[in-house]
Each structure stands twice: as C-alpha cells, then as structure tokens.
From Swiss-Prot:
Keyword hit for Repeat: yes
Highest taxon, organism lineage: Eukaryota
Family note: Belongs to the disease resistance NB-LRR family.
Region of interest: Disordered: 911-977, 1050-1070
Keyword ATP-binding attributed: yes
Record text about domains: The LRR repeats probably act as specificity determinant of pathogen recognition.
Biased composition (Polar residues): 912-927, 934-972
Protein name: Putative disease resistance protein At3g14460
Pfam families according to UniProt: LRR_R13L1-DRL21, NB-ARC, Rx_N, WH_DRP
Length: 1424
C-alpha cells in the first residue's frame, strides 16, 4: 500500500534541474554536467511507469521490490540536489560578505568541493537509478494515464465540515440517551463525580457524539463548569490535572507538583457542578485513576466525568456507573451519511437513481462504521459519473473485513503532492494534537511544498495542502479557527501503511532493527530512553528527521549527553529536522555544524546558555525554535548569515538585545520578539528591512530607544501582513510618581506616535507606557481591522484614546491606569467630537485596577451606547461611585467587584459590595460566562429538589441559588420560585438600575420562568431560558416586538401576539411548524403542536388540566415527553401515553393517573426511558410486562408504590431493562414472585425503601448485573439463596442495619467484583474482614461507620492480591499497626477515625514511602 507519491518526487527534481541556474553554474565541469544530464534522463524515464507500479505492487512481489528500491534511489537523488543547492547557497553568503577577490576564491573552492565530495555520490546514485530503469521492461511496467483530470481541487471547495454542526445522522437516540445521563441527578457515587463511559471501536463516532452532547444547550445550562481534555494513550495524572486546571482558569499554571495541583483544583471546583470529558482514554491503571479523582471530591453533587474509550476494561477501572456502548450504524444510516457528504445540500430524493443504487451497496460495505462512510463519501464527492461509483463498489467488495482499504480509496484519489504530505504524518503518535503551523513547518523542512515557477509563499501552499486534507477527512479539526488538528487512529494506521519503512515511529523500549531505508524517525519520550533510541538509528545513514514527542509523562526535561549526541549527528549529515526540545543540554555539540542540510532546529525549553556561532553556518535553516530557553540571553553575532530563516521563536526567552545585522534576514516571516538593547545591539531601524513579517510582533524594552526618530525608521506602517502588535516598555524601580511628567514621558509619547502600524492590524497591546497621553492615530477609524485592544499599566496617562471610533473593535481591556480620574466623551468620539456611532462592534469591555477613576461620562444616544456589548467587567475601581452608564443592551452581563458604583447617582438602587467574590484574576475575567453571586457567608447553597437519574432528560432549569441565567427581572419570577431561599439575595442586590428598560442578564438558574411573557405565545417559546443567540439581532425580552425559538440550528422570530387565544401552527410560516423541540411553561391551555415535533417539554403549568386530544395519533415523530410540576394534570389524552414515545419523564405531577391510563392490550413497545418522580400518587403496581423495550426505569418518591406485576408466561427475553432505580418509596414491600425477568439488567439501585424486606428472588440469575446499590433499606436481613450474580463488579451496601457481611454471602466466589463498599449497620463487628470473606479480585474497598470496629484482620486480606485502594471512614474505635495490619496499597484514605488520626499524626511522610503507599490522605491532608 506504500509508495504512492514518487511521481511528485520525480517531477520536482526534474523541475529543479531545469530551472535552477545555480545548479547549472555549479555543474559546469565536464563530468558533473554529464552526471546531471544522466540523472535527469533516468528520472524522466522512470516517471511514467510509477503509477502502474503503484497499482501492481500490492499483488506482484517483484514490482513491490522494484518500487522500494527506486524510491530509495529517488530520495538519495534528492539528497544530491540538496547538497548542490547548499553549496550554491554557501557561495552566495560568502559573496555577500566578501569582495571580488573573495568571490573568485570562493568559486574555485566550490568546484573543488563538488569534484571531491559530491561527484562520487552523484555517480553512485545515477548508476542505481539507471539499474532500476533497465528493469522496467523486465517486470513489465507500462505507462499509466488517466482519462481525465481528477477533480479533487473542485470538490474541496464544499467541505464536509462545513455542514451544520450538531446535525447527527443515525445518532439522535444516542444523543438523547447521553444527554439524559448527563442531566440525571445520580447519588450513587457518594463524594465523587459520577463516571459515564462511552465505549466503542475506533471510528464509530464516540468523540463526535460526545462533542455534540457537550455543546448541547441543555448540558451547557446544567453544568456550571465544562472541560474537554484529550487524554491519549499515555495518561498521566499530573499532566491531565494541570490541563484541567488551565482549562478552567484560562491561564497558565506554574505549579509543578501533583498534590499542590490537586489542592488548587479542588478549591477551584469546590461547590460547583462540573462536566469533564476525557476524550480517547486508554489508561487501565487503577492507581492512576484513584489518584486523579482526588481533586474532585468537593465538587457539587451531580458532577459528571465522561470517558470516551475503546476498552471496557478502562470503564471498569474508572468505576463507571454507566457504560454507554456505541453501536455500528445501520446500512440506511451509512447511506444517509454518504449522501449528505457526497452531495451536500441536495435532497436524497433528487439523487440520480443509478447513483443511489450503487451508493447503497457501497454503504453496506462500510459495515456500519461512520468514519469509513465519511471517508468514502469524500472520495465519491468528486466523482459524479456512475461508472466511477461502480468501479469503487467493485473494488470495495473484497475488503469488507478491513477499514484500511476503505480509507485508502480516498488516499488514492489525492494528487501526488498531498499523498507525500499525508504519509509523513505517520511519524505522529496516535492521538497527537498538532497545530497548523507545526505541520506546515515540518512539510516545508522536508521540501514537500516546493512549487517551481511559483511566487507563492511556502506557508500559504502548506496551508492549502492542510485545508485540502481536512476537507478529505484525513484530519479532524479541533476548533472552528482551523488551528488545531488530530488524525484519527485509523487514518494514522493508513499513513503508516502508505509510508512503509521510510517513516519509523518508535513507541517503546523494545528497539527493533530500524531499516536502512528509513528517512523519518520519531519516538515517544515517555516510552523510550533517548540514549537507546538515538543509538538505534545510527545505521540509518540517510535519515532526515529526528522528532521526539512530549507525551504526558515526559514534560519534565530529560538528560541527553554529548557522548550520545556527537556520534549520532556525525553519522547523520543529511538531517533536515532535529528536535532536542526539553532535554537538559547546556551546550550544543560541535557535530551540529556538519548538518548542512538542516532546515528545522528545535531547542525550545532546553538549558542552553549560548547559541554557538557555528549554528550560523547552517545556511538552509528555515525554522529556529528557542522559546522558553531561560538561560539564553543573547543570539550569535553572525545570525544574519541564516539568509533562509523564516521563523524565529523567542517567546519566554530573556534576551537582552537583538544582534546587529538582523535586518539581513529578509526571508523572515515570523519574529515573536524584537528586544531593544540599552547600549548596543540592533536598533528599531533594522525592522524596516523585515518587510514580510506576519503573525504577532512584540517589541520589548522600548524605554531603551534613544531617539524618537528611530521608531519612525522601524517602518511599522509598511508592514501590512502583521496581525498583532505588542509594544512594551519596562518600568524600572518603584514605578511612577504622580505628576512627574518629565522628558522621559514626552519621549515615550513621541516614540509611540512614530510606531503607528498598518491599518490592517487586528490586535494591539500597549504595556507599561509612561507617556501622559496617547497619539491621535490610536483610535483613528482608518484602523478598520482592529478587533482587540489592551492598554495595561499606563501609569502616567490622564486620558484614554478615542478607541470608540474603531469600527471593528470587539474586545477592549483597560488595566492599571493609576492616576486616571475621568473617562469622558473623548473616549467615545475623540477630540473632534466625531458623531460616528461609538463602539459599534464592541462585545467585551473591561476596566481593572484603576484606583483614582471616579467619573464616567457617557453620551446620550437614541439607540443607546455599546449596542453589541455582551459583557461589562469593572473590578478594583474603588473610587468609581457616580452614575452607571445608561442605555446598555438588555442582554449585557455585568460584573462588578471592589467598586461602589451606584446605578443612579444619589439613588437608593445600587450594586452592593457583596459581589466581591467574583474572581479577581485579570486573566480569568474574559472567560466568565455568567454572573456568580454568593450567600452572605460566601458559601453557595444548593437546592435539594429532585432531579433526573441516568437515562432521563431532566428539567431544563437548575436550582442552584447562587447562579442565574435569565432575561427576566427578578420580580417577574413565578411566586412559587420567590421562596425564602431567594429572599436572601434580594437584600444584597437591591434591584436593577432603573435606566435599564429591559434588565440585563442576572438571576440564578431560574431559567425559563418569565411570567410576563404572553401565555398565548408559550407553546412556541424557545428551548429553556430564551437566551439570545449572539448572531441574531432580534430581541427576546418581555415587551419587545419579537421572540426567539430554536429549531435545531434554525433561528426564527415569531410576532408577539396580543390576543388571549392559543396559537395554532396555521398562524405561522411553514418552516416554523417544522420545529422539533418545544418547551412550554406557565400556560393553562395547549392546543395544536408543530407537526414534526420530536420532543415536548411541559413545565410548571399549574393551570393545565389536559393535553391536546390528538397527541397520541397526530404526532408520529414525538419521541420525548417531559411533564414537570403540572399539579392539575390528571390523565393522558386517549386514556394512555403516546405509543411512539421513547422517553417519558414525569415529575411533581401528583394527580396524574399513570396506571389507569395504561391498557393491558396495548404494548408500549417503543418506550426505552421512563422516570416517575413525586408523581402519580395512585401508582401501586407497575406493569413491567407492558414495556418490553424499556431500558431504564426510575421510580422516585412514590408513596403508594408497592410492587411490580409481570404478565403470566412472559419469556425471559421479553424485557430489555438494563437499569432499575427505586428511591424513596416507603411502601415498596416485595418484588414479583420468582424474581425479575430482566436478563439484561446491568445496574440496580434501591434506596430509602423502609418496608422492603428482601431482594428479588434468584438474584444470582441476573448474570448481566454489574453494579448493585442497596441504601437505607433497614428491613432487609439476608441475601437470596444462590448469592449475588457472578459477574457483579460493584457492590454497595449502605445504612442497612440488618445486613451484616458474612461468608455465606459467597463474596469470595465473585471473581469479577472490583469495588466493595459497606457503610454502617454493623454494630456486632469488632474485627474486619473475616478470613475468607473477600474475593481475590477486589480492587477498591470502603468501610464506613463500623461503630465498634477495633482491628483489621490481616488474615482476611491474605488472598486479596488485587486490592490497591482502601478507604476507612467513621470508625472511631479502630486501631491498627501501620506496618502490620494494612495490605499492600496504592491509595489509602482515612477520615473521621479519631484514634487512627492520632496514630498517623505521629508518622512521617517518608514512612509511607517505605511502606510503598504512594498516596495517603488523612482527613483531607495529603501525604505522598
């Protein structure tokens, strides 16, 4: 399957020979000229048969051997041409540095070097190529020509990823189920977040589904904090914990030890409900998982961790409460997916019938794998001819057992240059996230972007190549900005297959023999010792790439000695890419100067103290990465000789100055930092010659500019390609003295005036500027492209620039203006009082740390100020007391802390100082998405109201009193929500500023309760809380002229009616009746519904007594029905629930008669998820047999419920129930005689059922049962005969006073039991565990509230070899001998055990290390 891109190689080499005058000049000698011609002839002769060789290599051994040989010869020929080009480049550098005499001497030396060094190599390569050319006829290769030009470039214009996000094919039920799991209120994991595992084979769509669910509006509203982390194969607790913390805080975390990180993360998440997704999780280490979970113990109940993984073992290790198994798609779903990506927006009915017939056969061949369907669709997209589809189908039929042939079809359709670029990506480890710049620089270094006769930048060519590969589904983009990407594992396998031996990725210390033909080598630092890895490749003499990757456990710098490096680099003179990043090297080896072909050198995060001058002889060098070299303070003086240098990264490196002559680096495209020296070094004028600079340029130490005229010489105004500019002064000493407007300050103003950039600039930042005012250009409307401005630490400024006239400005941050007192009209209009609309695009405005600011004067405008403002943040402005700005948009989120600002000057309404708990870190402010309020004590108070369990969609509102998302005023909340829990906040907030005609976003998750919205409109209101779409200009506030509803990505506005009649679909446009989701609140009549309705949510409709009569017949697509707090609703229409339902959720509907409405003759064959909570007061007997497909059943707080009924003769295969939960049912007495006929039941929870006397009979027969939780069932005394099911993995018995663990339970025989928790109710036990009680498999043991427990029985742990985690809680009489009673453990937690706490208080941390207990936690204090 390899070697599909050689024609690109040949074409490029022939073009180089034809077009490079320098090569011709170098090879003027008779022998070298002849060799160059022979090389060209061999390439031209071999090129036409390469495609034929590709096709036959997979089936004919001789052809495959020939192809491998000529590929190696081609690469050696590339090396020869590169050496010749390097010699020409060297001559050019010497010529520029010397005179005519030097030029003649240089020319003679160059020819001599060619004759002695290069010609012998050239002769060898030419003979090798000619040898392979002679065998073309022998093995029967022929010219290969396509009948037409492939249309891949045209197809790439309409990219699959451009389809509407969130639109699923064949996964609607999966999405609903997973959303319901996340919204459920699961109390199973006491003191820990619940874990949900999404399991499936590679390519089945785990990540895609989880990402869509992660962004679902209900999930976003439900969780206060959401985090997404790509875990990868080499899971590391420290790295992932750090990544989680950085994701939350949106700022760098410098802590370098795990316990401190965990404490910091625990504090950050304390009292918050969070959702964490660990994507592509591989780790099967129990100890790592236990250690990772430590930081989440203080989070709010209902927090969730979601794992996507391909291994069920991983789910067991993580103690997943719910394992969601991803299934393959049906053939119909595969066809829908293929047609969508192959035909774009064309409806299926419009597709050519012949194409459709062939396409459906192809869909069958995809075997239900979405990745395969999408990849093949990308290939078919460029082939509208049925003959092409038939050829694909015919070729496909023999590959039904493997995905790689499916993926290779797309690969075969790529042009040669893209094939070679894709193949190089096989050096990336699976799961490696790479950014656009990283990949393009690597392609450039291997010379894969060369286009003869093209004037385009190499970087632009590379970006196009990357975009085409993304469009063809070879890469998956991780963000909408197209900057981060990942390759699916199957695509990684494909890259490895097509690259063959020429790319080698080492992933462990079992070093195989690396083929001599290998050109590109990578390895994982965590799995491979560097010295071993480097020594293993010395025999690969033609190696071009050495690239180590930072897997999670390798973030700390590693040791690498010159003893290892020198022989390696001496042997590999053909290297183009070399990365030594993060290694603890202090000096570069001299052998580095022999790497004349090197184009990419990464020395970032090393400990080098200087960059030797010989580095400047590497004239091919294009990329030099020196970021975070903390000991490097200068660059070599001869750096100007690197005339091919295109990127110089100096971020985080403390350079004192730039060396003189840097202006000669005219190829430089990106320079991260230009440092101005105090007495020497390059001046600002040298920037003038660097006309191609792009990206963001930082100019540091501007206080060292001696004359303002130097700034003008920088020529920033003539740099149109710069996106961002940072101008930074450094303030020496204590800072400033108020009123000290001296000459220095004036000079700085003049310098800043001269540094006017090009109008195309997008982001601009000024730091520590000490001028008294800003130049006029800053704020000029001609800067139409600026979207972000940050002004920081401008201590002597007494006014702000007129940035209100920047038409595209979206983000403005003004920080630490220590003497500024007034923000006036000039801030909006400038000195000329321009009447252009100020701040017409501004979305975020932040003021921070301005101690003397006391007055804010805003203009009075007809349309209000800041028309697009989404967030206003004012922090640490203690003098600002006067009038709050009027006319803000109604949806603006306002954050105020450490500021006594009054809403109306002299009025009673004000924002009180109680809002000071808002995070004060400047870095964290822009990421805030809601207002956070705290109770007077600063501790959030959670509401104990009932919410959903796994498998059910919950009410959209959340009842955390300390958060709000609503567009209604507080006074408009329904009376039942204005409870004493909320009253405590009214005294703190007062009321909103009176000038807000429609109040800003403020409330605490009372979303959706807007009582003054016309009730007639309610049937067509939006998904919860009516949160405005930022892309839609329509208003959604009460009293406005339009309201919004969401139709799965389609936004529409509905006229606000004034009549009291219910609205019918006929009153609206056709597209509005296509609504799929509808939520209604606070209505008394619900008439007709949208015809295509799939989900109906009825909430808090006290006056609603009935549902639409035609609900059961007229809405065949209705799959989800949620009824919450409808206290007057008594029955379903037609005497039974709709039979089309898959999810039915009923809560707080006491009068609803559920059982009487069920018809014994009717099977509710579609219902899969059923939740009944605090409802149906007449529910006594639940007819389980009427629900054959029910997968999840939860009955909560149903006082009358007593038992289940099973229809006589029901077969064991009839009921599909997988999850059963019964809580707070005080009259539940028994289960059906003979037990539960639920062979698929995997999870069962019984909680607070005071009269329940026994578990189901034949419990042992429930062989699918994996987890069993028995909580607060005081009358259960024994376990049914036969004991527990054999496959049980998790057993929790809590507060069941009469259930005492005994050998008779047969726990010892449970070979799969991993997690055992016994909590309370064991008054007679003084020693635990009894010998022979515990199974060998138990991994985690928790014992709690054993009131009389005095000792641990060492013999009871004798056979428990797997146990790693033990938790002991609430055992006040327990005493143990640390070194004798405890089994070998990885994790030990002790809490509320007074005697044990005293014992361990005397033990040093080192003692635990001696005992081999890596993690010990005692009453929250960590010892490790």
């Amino acid at each position: 399957m390899a070697n599909s891109y050689l024609s690109s190689c040949a074409n490029v080499m022939v073009e180089r020979i034809n077009t490079s005058q320098e090569l011709v000049e170098l090879c003027k000698g008779k022998s070298s000229s002849a060799l160059l011609k022979r090389l060209k002839v061999a390439l031209v002769t071999a090129n036409p048969v390469l495609a034929d060789a590709d096709q036959r290599a997979e089936h004919v051994r001789e052809v495959k051997h020939w192809l491998t040989g000529i590929k190696d010869a081609f690469f050696q020929a590339e090396d020869i041409l590169d050496e010749l080009q390097t010699e020409a480049l060297r001559r050019r550098v010497v010529a520029e540095a010397g005179g005519l005499g030097g030029l003649f001497q240089n020319l003679m030396a160059g020819r001599e070097a060619i004759q002695k060094k290069i010609e012998p190599k050239m002769e060898k390569v030419v003979r090798l190529l000619e040898h392979h050319v002679k065998h073309i006829e022998v093995i029967g290769l022929k010219e290969y020509s396509e009948t037409r030009e492939p249309q891949w470039r045209q197809a790439s214009r309409s990219r699959p990823d451009d389809l509407p996000q969130g639109r699923l094919v064949g996964r609607v039920e999966d999405k609903l189920a997973l959303v319901n799991l996340l919204l459920s209120d699961d109390e199973i994991s006491i003191g820990k977040p619940a874990v949900i595992s999404v399991v499936g084979m590679p390519g089945v769509g785990k990540t895609t589904l989880t990402e869509i669910v992660f962004n679902d509006y209900r999930v976003t509203e439900h969780f206060e904090v959401k985090m997404w982390i790509s875990a990868g194969i080499n899971f590391n607790v420290f790295t992932v914990t750090k990544a989680v913390l950085q994701d939350i805080t949106s700022s760098a975390v410098n802590t370098e030890d795990l316990p401190s990180l965990q404490i910091q993360l625990k504090k950050t998440l304390s009292g918050k409900r969070f959702l964490l997704v660990l994507d592509d999780f591989w780790s099967e280490s129990d100890s790592e998982w236990e250690s990772f979970q430590v930081a989440f113990t203080d989070a709010e109940e209902g927090s969730k961790i979601v794992l996507t993984t391909r291994s069920e073992i991983v789910s067991t290790v993580a103690k997943a409460e719910k394992i969601y198994q991803m299934k393959l798609m049906t053939n119909e779903e595969c066809w829908e997916l293929i047609s969508r990506f192959a035909f774009g927006n064309i409806s299926v009915g419009s597709i050519n019938q012949e194409l459709e017939g062939i396409g459906k056969r192809i869909a069958e061949q995809c075997k239900g794998l979405p990745l395969a369907a999408r990849a093949i669709a990308s290939h078919l997209r460029s082939k509208p001819n049925p003959d092409d589809w038939y050829a694909v189908s015919k070729n496909f039929s023999s590959y039904t057992n493997s995905i790689l042939p499916v993926l290779k079809l797309s690969y075969d359709s790529l042009p040669p240059q893209l094939k070679r670029c894709f193949a190089l990506c096989s050096i990336f480890p699976k799961g490696h996230v790479f950014d656009r710049e990283e990949l393009v620089l690597l392609w450039m270094a291997i010379d894969l972007l060369y286009q003869p006769r093209s004037s385009r930048r190499l970087e632009d060519i590379g970006n196009d190549y990357l975009g085409d590969l993304v469009a063809q589904s070879f890469f998956q983009r991780l963000d909408i900005t197209m900057t981060s990407f990942v390759m699916h594992d199957l695509m990684n396998d494909l890259a490895k297959a097509v690259s063959g031996d020429f790319c080698f990725r080492l992933e462990d210390d079992n070093i195989p023999e690396i083929p001599s033909t290998t050109r590109h080598f990578s390895f994982s630092r965590s799995q491979c010792d560097a010295s071993v890895a480097f020594r293993s490749i010395c025999g690969a003499e033609f190696l071009r790439t050495i690239l180590p990757f930072n897997s999670p456990t390798s973030l700390e710098s590693l040791q690498l000695t010159e003893k290892v490096l020198n022989p390696l680099l001496n042997a590999l003179s053909g290297l183009r890419i070399l990365s030594l990043s993060h290694y603890q090297i202090t000096n570069l080896p001299k052998s580095l100067k022999g790497l004349k072909l090197l184009r990419y050198l990464d020395l970032s995060s090393t400990k080098i103290k200087e960059l030797p001058e010989f580095v400047c002889t590497l004239c091919n060098l294009q990329t030099l990465l020196l970021s975070n070299c903390r000991d490097l303070t200068s660059l070599p003086k001869s750096i100007a000789e690197l005339i091919n240098l295109r990127l110089l990264d100096l971020v985080g490196t403390p350079l004192v100055e730039m060396p003189p002559g840097i202006k000669k680096l005219r190829s430089l495209q990106k320079l991260s930092n230009f440092v101005i020296g105090r007495l020497s070094g390059a001046g600002l004028h040298e920037l003038k010659e660097l006309s191609h600079l792009r990206g963001t340029l930082r100019i540091s130490e501007l206080q060292n500019v001696a004359f303002a005229s130097e700034a003008k010489d920088a020529g920033l105004k003539r740099k149109p390609f710069l996106d961002g500019l940072i101008l930074k002064w450094t303030v020496k000493g204590s800072g400033f003295v108020p009123g000290s407007f001296n000459a220095l300050a004036c000079d700085q103003k003049e310098v800043l005036r001269m540094l006017e950039p090009h109008p195309h600039l997008k982001t601009f930042c000024i730091e520590s500027y000490q001028g008294g005012a800003f130049p006029k250009w800053l704020g000029d409307s001609s800067f139409f492209g600026i979207t972000s401005v940050t002004l920081s630490s401008c201590n002597l400024c007494i006014s702000l620039p007129p940035v209100g006239q920047l038409p595209s400005l979206k983000y403005l941050s003004i920080e630490k203006f220590n003497i500024l007192q007034k923000v006036g009209l000039d801030f909006f209009f400038g000195e000329n009082n321009s009447r252009g609309v100020p701040f017409q695009s501004l979305q975020i405005l932040k003021f921070y740390g301005m101690p003397r600011w006391d007055e804010w004067i805003c203009p009075e405008l007809e349309d209000g100020i800041f028309p697009c403002l989404q967030k206003l943040i004012i922090q640490r402005c203690p003098s600002l007391r006067k009038k709050f700005p009027e006319g803000l948009p109604s949806s603006t989120e306002v954050t105020i802390s450490d500021c006594p600002l009054r809403a109306v000057s002299g009025g009673e309404n004000s924002f009180r100082r109680s809002l000071t708990n808002i995070p004060e870190s400047p870095a964290s402010i822009p990421s805030m998405s809601r207002r956070e309020l705290s109770s007077p004590t600063g501790n959030p108070k959670s509401d104990a109201s009932t919410s959903a369990q796994p498998g059910f969609a919950s009410s959209s509102q959340s009842n955390d009193d300390n958060e709000v998302t609503s567009t209604s005023s507080l006074s408009s909340l329904p009376k039942d929500r204005q409870t004493e829990d909320f009253d405590q906040y009214e005294t703190q907030l007062g009321s909103l500023p009176q000038q807000f005609e429609e109040p800003a976003v403020i409330s605490a998750r009372y979303s959706g309760y807007i009582s003054d919205i016309p009730s007639t409109l309610s049937p067509y209101m939006s998904r919860t809380s009516l949160v405005p779409d930022p892309k839609n200009e329509g208003s959604i506030l009460p009293g406005s002229s339009s309201y919004q509803y969401h139709q799965y990505g389609i936004k529409s506005s509905v006229p606000s009616p004034r009549s009291s009649e219910a609205i019918k679909p006929s009153q609206y446009d056709d597209d509005e009746t296509d609504m799929e989701y509808l939520k209604v609140t606070d209505i008394s009549h619900l008439m007709e519904l949208p015809q295509n309705l799939q989900s109906l949510h009825i909430d808090s409709c006290d006056g609603l007594t009935s549902l639409p009569e035609n609900l059961t017949e007229s809405y065949p697509n209705l799959h989800e029905l949620l009824i919450i707090a409808c206290h007057s609703l008594e029955s379903f229409p037609g005497s039974h629930p709709p039979t089309t339902l898959k999810t039915l959720y009923i809560r707080d509907c006491k009068k609803l008669n559920f059982t009487e409405s069920l018809q014994p003759t009717r099977s509710y064959s579609q219902l899969e998820y059923l939740f009944i909570g605090s409802s149906c007061s007449n529910l006594v007997n639940f007819p389980l047999s009427l629900f054959p497909k029910l997968r999840s059943l939860s009955i909560r707080d149903c006082e009358s419920f007593k038992t289940f009924s099973i229809h006589a003769g029901l077969g064991d295969d009839r009921i599909a129930l997988e999850s059963l939960e019964i809580r707070d049912c005080p009259n539940l007495e028994t289960f059906p005689q003979g037990g539960l006929p639920t062979p698929k039941l995997s999870s069962m929870l019984l909680s607070n059922c005071k009269k329940l006397q026994a578990l189901p009979e034949k419990l042992f027969g429930l062989t699918s049962l994996l987890s069993l939780f028995i909580i607060k069932c005081p009358e259960i005394e024994t376990i049914p005969g036969g004991g527990f099911p054999s496959n049980l993995r998790t057993l929790c018995i809590s507060l069941c006073d009469k259930l005492t663990p005994r050998i008779e339970w047969g726990l010892r025989d449970l070979e799969n039991l991993r997690n055992l928790e016994i909590d309370g109710g064991n008054e007679d036990i003084e020693s635990f565990p009894e010998e022979g009680l515990l199974p060998k498999s138990v991994f985690s043991l928790r014992i709690s509230r054993f009131e009389n427990l005095k000792t641990l029985n060492r013999k009871g742990f004798h056979d428990t070899k797997a146990i790693e985690t033990m938790e002991i809680s609430g055992c006040d009489k327990l005493q143990i001998s640390i070194d004798e009673d405890l089994p070998p453990l990885s994790c030990l937690r002790i809490s509320s055990c007074s005697l044990l706490t005293e014992t361990f208080a005397e033990v040093e941390t080192e003692f635990f290390k001696v005992l081999n207990i890596p993690y010990v936690e005692i009453d929250g204090e960590i010892f490790s």
